[in-house]
Regions:
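Glycine-rich, aromatic-lined ligand/substrate-binding cores of catalytic
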Residues: 3-133, 141-144, 150-200, 204-213
């Protein structure tokens, strides 16, 4: 069993005319969001890991270790460590390593491609389906369901945190709950400190569309 902590904050955009709060639509995303995940230490990491998602124009401050001459772009990934950081554009393109005490990005050389064949991971996926569950082709997948399932769970928990921040304190109240740290028990698939947030984790399917899992 592993637990996660998630919290999110989103803006309320006022009308320019009279500065009355804009309506909130459950069917659409907020104009921007800031989501923080906290992962407890585990067998593969001996300390807490914090991951932050930003969108809608929100950006982190320019790290001091990266000089003002280096462009870090508008979208991307920033991994901060004790002795340096790794920056890349979106989808991990053009990754660069910066180490404290060294000027500029560190040259790490070209990394060789793995199984560089046409339609690489797509072909591996088809081969695994043909070979069947538990086959060598299945075990060798670089992104099988054992990995992709928890990854999707993490992303969707961020959406649950965003939607939870837009819950009102009571049916008659105009005050929103706002940012609240949610405690998640993945084994039970349950948010343990805000029961109303659990409505965003599952849904009631129409007759004939049940998943039966």
């Amino acid at each position: 069993m592993y637990k996660r902590q998630i919290e999110a904050s989103v803006p309320r955009v006022p009308y320019v005319a009279d500065f009355t709060p804009a309506p909130v639509y459950e069917e659409s995303c907020p104009p921007s969001s800031y989501v923080t995940y906290r992962f407890r230490p585990s067998k593969i990491n001996d300390s807490e890991v914090k991951m932050i998602w930003m969108d809608g124009g929100i950006r982190p401050s320019h790290p001091e270790i990266i000089t003002d001459k280096d462009q870090i772009g508008d979208n991307g990934i920033l991994m901060l460590g004790e002795n340096g950081l790794i920056w890349s554009d979106y989808y991990g393109v053009n990754a660069r390593l910066y180490i404290k005490g060294q000027k500029g990005a560190v040259e790490v050389g070209k990394i060789s491609e793995i199984n560089s064949v046409e339609f690489g991971h797509q072909k591996h996926w088809v081969d695994a389906i043909k070979a069947g569950f538990g086959s060598e082709e299945h075990k060798n997948l670089t992104s099988n369901f054992d990995f992709a399932g928890p990854l999707s769970e993490i992303v969707l928990l961020g959406n649950a945190a965003i939607r939870s921040s837009l819950l009102k304190r009571s049916p008659r109240s105009n005050i929103y709950i706002g940012r609240k740290q949610l405690l998640y028990d993945s084994k039970k698939m349950e948010i343990t400190n805000l029961d109303r947030a659990n409505q965003f984790l599952t849904r009631k399917y129409r007759n004939g569309w049940d998943l039966n899992v």
